[in-house]
């Protein structure tokens, strides 16, 4: 065995062994329990970052642990390789997205291999290949045939100068990123999938996701947003028109003083024909963004339409206002405004001098709405026949009256909107729909799939090549001329079913149901919580679509979900001569000074610039505080990086990158190597014989098996990898202090090292692989079994008993593990410290808690 730990040499040899022996390639085996471990696949941006490393290390730890449990473990990897960044890179580098993407895949693939992740590379997929997106296109046509796909107009960001659609990321301060032209909102036809048809099931089945974090489940419940309310019809005074409004608070209906409608509402557009101020307001709203997040914080503005709504119960007329906080594509595009009981309505009414009336008051007092709306549920008053009713009774009475008079209906609504899957970009899967010469829109026939995306293109940064090339769109279907759809799929489409394709990645069909149903559902899924409401919801939705197509037989795609925290690093900058911030990499910081609490108070970079320290923040390009994993692997080895990632923080919490911590992890591995090296050079011919052990030897062996029990629970059930590592470190401390003078001493250390290398194998697999062989094991560690606790070793010969006199600890005594109360009491009473504190007192009571405590009460 080499005396010195040499990570680069060891890791290269072990990785070659895994590659040559196809160690992690698996097939279905009905005789073995399966375990499917999956980390969210990466976008091939060019280089791995530490967030990737943390995600994939967690996944690899889980997969390797389950493998040593004897399970048939699938851990695949692939590339989420369509998307806008490739287009931007292609424009900047004067190339096409395809070669840029494929080069990045090769580079990042090598980085993943250097980190020693145990992937089944035979199942590798890239979503930008026709072999993958062909089946996505096929499935979309099947959804269309089932009535789950439709086309309607929807708003997009439009640059009038370039005459092109912009992604949200390409709109900067309301202007086009390329030409600085003010961006407009434009209505264009787009494709949608009816996720709302599954809203109830998606909501109800959240309750079955026992292995998912509560935070993610709450976020999904809120995103789906089920509400029970009433949809009612308001007439329009002086017009033969009406419009609908949905509310979850019909109990406040008698307090409506105005109605707010979206700028795009048909009534607003009618009124604008004779109202120039309103027409200008509508144009302004059309050109502003309409995300819910922005609506919540922007100034609430409106214009009176001159129209009046007729209250469905009182017949009273209330003004109709066009308002910028009402969206046409959300609900009915109109809201009843009750400023006495809704704060947004209150502020709007105050701003424009509209009436404010109170119709709800607390059960036990009066209501004051002079400064703010009263938004709690309470008792109705100023509400005519409904006075005195509480929320529930008021809700039902008003709903029943509206239903009886044909002016309303009870309704369950969802916040969830249908999924708009059209993107006016190039680098995505073409949407497989065609328009015939007579205007009929039909799916591309199956025998014409895949609709290939041309990869040999020139990006001009203005228009998608498949939109610019009029010839590309031309095709024929059943002998008729037709035009292809030139929009491409939202890239969330690819990531919604990739997990299932891994089960049969080379099948000449979307999924091989037998293989898919062997592996699915995923047993452990790992990824960031930022995906809770988009990817993870589409992921669940797609699984139900696959189920209803007869391709899978489970209801949910993943049993357990672990959402790992972000990786943070120190961030530094200086102000240059132009007054701009220049962010400096932590690796380029030459010296730092710290206060007595370890906080950085001064920092200077390699060029002598005095730096401003802004604290720990998420590793990012913008702050130049990302640490290249490859640099760390070359310096310390992959095992060290992996160990630090697992030890520095619980997996769900943020991890603070500290190179001092990396150095500590490296020192620990060297200590383990040194201990193993010393052991293999001892005479280890004597086999362990538990009957021959001294009490000290038994105590050490007890620590070994307590550690096995703890690490097994920490990794397998609790997924607290940091405490698992801490437990092994503590055991190592015991071993380093233990004597190595007798055959049984060496036998116990041999047993301990055999356990440690398997306990640490999921985390530091290269060094564990090597040490396992050096310890004299004939087979490789991948073929071994996880260490098993010897229950007999945990049995203690003696117990430490705390002795209290009148509630205060006065002594600690060691007794035989099977000692009875009388012998413990006799030993306790004879202790010199106890005798001292009982002097002059009469013992009134003695309480013995077996194995723990002897309590003496005396006065």
Swiss-Prot record:
PROSITE patterns: AA_TRNA_LIGASE_I. It catalyses: tRNA(Leu) + L-leucine + ATP = L-leucyl-tRNA(Leu) + AMP + diphosphate. It is found in: Cytoplasm. GO terms for molecular function: aminoacyl-tRNA deacylase activity; ATP binding; leucine-tRNA ligase activity. The keyword ATP-binding applies. Its EC number is 6.1.1.4. SUPFAM superfamilies: Anticodon-binding domain of a subclass of class I aminoacyl-tRNA synthetases (SSF47323), Nucleotidylyl transferase (SSF52374), ValRS/IleRS/LeuRS editing domain (SSF50677). The keyword ATP-binding applies. It is an enzyme of class 6 (ligase). Gene3D superfamilies: 2.20.28.290, 3.10.20.590, HUPs, Isoleucyl-tRNA Synthetase, Domain 1. ATP binds at residue 621. It comes from the Bacteria. Keywords: Aminoacyl-tRNA synthetase, ATP-binding, Cytoplasm, Ligase, Nucleotide-binding, Protein biosynthesis. A motif ('KMSKS' region) lies at residues 618-622. This is Leucine--tRNA ligase. It comes from Shewanella baltica (strain OS195). The lineage of its organism: Bacteria, Pseudomonadati, Pseudomonadota, Gammaproteobacteria, Alteromonadales.
């Amino acid at each position: 065995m080499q005396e010195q730990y040499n990570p680069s040499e060891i890791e290269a040899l072990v990785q070659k062994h895994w590659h040559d022996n196809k160690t992690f390639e698996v097939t279905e085996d009905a005789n073995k329990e399966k375990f499917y471990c999956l980390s969210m696949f990466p976008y091939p941006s060019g280089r791995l970052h530490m967030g990737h490393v943390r995600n994939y290390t967690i996944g690899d730890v889980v997969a390797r642990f389950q493998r040593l449990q004897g399970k048939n473990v699938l851990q695949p990897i692939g590339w989420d390789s369509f998307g806008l960044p490739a287009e931007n890179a292609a424009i900047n580098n004067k190339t096409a997205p395809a070669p840029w993407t494929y080069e990045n895949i090769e580079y990042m693939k090598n980085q993943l291999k250097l980190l020693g992740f145990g992937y089944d590379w035979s199942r590798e997929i890239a979503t930008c290949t026709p072999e993958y997106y062909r089946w996505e296109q096929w499935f979309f046509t099947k959804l269309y045939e089932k009535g789950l796909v439709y086309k309607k107009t929807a708003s997009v960001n439009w640059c009038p100068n370039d005459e092109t659609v912009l992604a949200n990321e390409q709109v900067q301060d309301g202007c086009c990123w390329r030409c600085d032209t003010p961006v407009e909102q434009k209505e264009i036809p787009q494709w949608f999938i009816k996720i709302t048809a599954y809203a109830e099931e998606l909501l109800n089945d959240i309750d079955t996701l026992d292995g998912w974090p509560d935070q993610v489940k709450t976020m999904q419940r809120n995103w789906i947003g089920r509400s029970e309310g009433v949809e009612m019809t308001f007439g329009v005074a002086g017009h033969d028109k009406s419009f609908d409004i949905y509310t979850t608070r019909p109990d406040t209906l008698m307090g409506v003083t105005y109605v707010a409608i979206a700028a795009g509402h048909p009534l607003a557009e009618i009124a604008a024909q004779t109202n120039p101020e309103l027409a200008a307001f509508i144009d302004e709203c059309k050109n502003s963004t309409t995300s819910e997040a922005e609506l919540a914080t922007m100034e609430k503005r409106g214009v009176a339409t001159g129209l009046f709504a007729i209250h469905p119960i009182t017949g009273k007329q209330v003004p109709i206002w066009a308002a910028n906080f009402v969206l046409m594509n959300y609900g009915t595009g109109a809201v009843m405004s009750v400023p006495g009981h809704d704060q947004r309505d209150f502020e709007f009414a105050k701003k424009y001098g509209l009436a404010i009336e109170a119709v709800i008051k607390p059960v036990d007092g009066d209501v004051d709405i002079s400064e703010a709306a009263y938004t709690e549920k309470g008792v109705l008053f100023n509400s005519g026949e409904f006075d005195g009713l509480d929320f529930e009774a008021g809700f039902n009475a008003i709903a029943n009256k509206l239903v009886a008079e044909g002016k309303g209906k009870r309704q369950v609504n969802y916040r969830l909107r249908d999924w708009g899957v059209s993107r006016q970009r190039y680098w995505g899967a073409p949407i497989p729909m065609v328009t015939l010469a007579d205007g009929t829109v039909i799916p591309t026939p199956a025998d014409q799939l895949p609709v290939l995306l041309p990869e040999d293109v020139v990006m001009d940064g203005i228009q998608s090549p498949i939109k610019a090339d009029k010839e590309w769109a031309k095709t024929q279907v059943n002998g008729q001329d037709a035009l292809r759809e030139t929009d491409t799929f939202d890239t969330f489409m690819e990531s919604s079913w990739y997990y299932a394709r891994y089960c049969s990645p080379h099948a000449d069909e979307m999924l091989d149901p037998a293989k898919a149903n062997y592996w699915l559902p995923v047993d452990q899924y790992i990824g960031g919580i930022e995906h809770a409401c988009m990817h993870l919801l589409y992921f669940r939705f797609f699984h139900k679509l696959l189920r209803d197509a007869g391709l899978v037989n489970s209801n949910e795609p993943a049993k357990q979900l672990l959402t790992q925290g972000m990786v943070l690093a120190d961030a530094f900058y200086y102000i240059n001569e132009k007054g701009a911030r220049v962010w400096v990499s932590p690796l380029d910081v030459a010296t730092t000074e710290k206060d007595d609490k370890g906080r950085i108070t001064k920092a200077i970079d390699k060029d002598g610039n005095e730096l401003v320290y802004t604290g720990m923040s998420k590793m990012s390009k913008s702050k130049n505080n990302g640490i290249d994993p490859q640099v760390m692997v070359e310096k310390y080895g992959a095992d060290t990086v992996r160990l630090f990632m697992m030890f520095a923080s619980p997996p769900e919490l943020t991890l603070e990158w500290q190179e001092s911590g990396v150095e500590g992890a490296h020192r620990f591995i060297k200590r383990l190597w040194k201990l193993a090296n010393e052991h293999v050079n001892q005479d280890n011919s004597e086999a362990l014989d538990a009957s021959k052990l001294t009490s000290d030897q038994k105590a050490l062996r007890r620590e070994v098996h307590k550690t096995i029990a703890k690490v097994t629970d920490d990794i397998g059930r609790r997924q607290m990898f940091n405490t698992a590592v801490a437990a092994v470190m503590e055991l190592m401390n015991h071993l380093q202090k233990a004597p190595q003078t007798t055959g049984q001493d060496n036998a116990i250390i041999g047993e301990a090292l055999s356990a440690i290398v398997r306990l640490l194998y999921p985390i530091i697999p290269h060094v564990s692989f090597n040490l396992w062989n050096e310890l004299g094991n004939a087979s490789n560690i991948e073929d071994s079994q996880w260490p098993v606790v010897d229950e007999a070793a945990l049995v203690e010969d003696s117990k430490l008993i705390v002795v209290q006199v009148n509630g205060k600890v006065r002594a600690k005594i060691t007794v035989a593990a099977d000692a009875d109360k009388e012998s413990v009491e006799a030993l306790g009473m004879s202790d010199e410290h106890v005798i001292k504190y009982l002097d002059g007192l009469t013992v009134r009571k003695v309480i013995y808690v077996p194995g723990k405590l002897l309590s003496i009460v005396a006065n």
